[in-house]
Structure formats: structure tokens, C-alpha cells
Amino acid sequence: MALMTWTAAEFGTNVGFADDQHKTIFDMVNKLHDTAATGNRSEIGKQLDALIDYVVMHFKSEETEMQKKGYADFAAHKAEHDKLVGVCADLQKKFHAGEAEVNQDTTRFVRDWLVNHIPKVDKLYGPCLSA
């Protein structure tokens, strides 16, 4: 069963590239959530790395568009991105050093961040970036 499901009503920003990337992130988190239940560290590590790489790329895409369009809340938005990237990088480093686990609690943390960030923060850039 999926940990999270993207719907336009709940998560749509009306910015095509962002919505498409959010859907991919949801799919990747769901896959990592299912794999985390198996305890297969090798596969978990591969999926964790792919997810973090994709999220970093996504954040850069959003930030580039925000700067191009002169989005007023760019600095605060980027600060939220930077904070999550820092948490993820620390987890990634510790996981690969054998000092941390990635389990379903981890994926629920990511879900909770996304289901708060997208509707409350990302949706605010919709009018600016889609103009």
C-alpha cells in the first residue's frame, strides 16, 4: 500500500515541471518505504541515494525558476530546502557508514515533511511561476 498519493487537489501547484517532479518524488518515497520494510541495506542505500539526488535536483529546479520569475519568498523557501538537504545528507552519510538505519519511520518523516511543505509552501509560488 502506498505511503503517500499525489493528487492535484492536495498537492498541485499549477506549475507543470514541479507537479511532475513531486509525483516522481512521491513514487520514489513509496518505493523506499516498501524496501525499508525488507531491511535489504544494499537496495535501501541505492534508493536512498537516488531519492536524495532527485530531491536536490528538484529543489534546484524550483529555485532557478523562483529566481527567474522574481519570487518574493525565495530566500525563506530556499532556507527550508537547505534545511531538509542538510538532514538528508547527514542521514545518507551515517547510513553508508553503518551508523544509522533507514526504516519506515524515516520514510514517514519524509512524507510528513512533503505533505506539509507542498501545500503550505510550494503552492504559494504557483501564481508567480505559472505566470
UniProtKB/Swiss-Prot annotation:
InterPro entries: Haemerythrin_Fe_BS (IPR016131), Hemerythrin (IPR050669), Hemerythrin-like (IPR012312), Hemerythrin-like_sf (IPR035938), Hemerythrin_metal-bd (IPR012827)
Binding positions (Fe cation 1): H22, H58, E62, D122
Cysteines engaged in disulfide bonds, as pairs: none
Keyword vocabulary terms for this entry: Iron, Metal-binding, Oxygen transport, Transport
Keyword Iron: yes
Stored NCBIfam families: bact_hemeryth, hemeryth_dom
Protein name stated in the entry: Bacteriohemerythrin
Originating organism: Methylococcus capsulatus (strain ATCC 33009 / NCIMB 11132 / Bath)
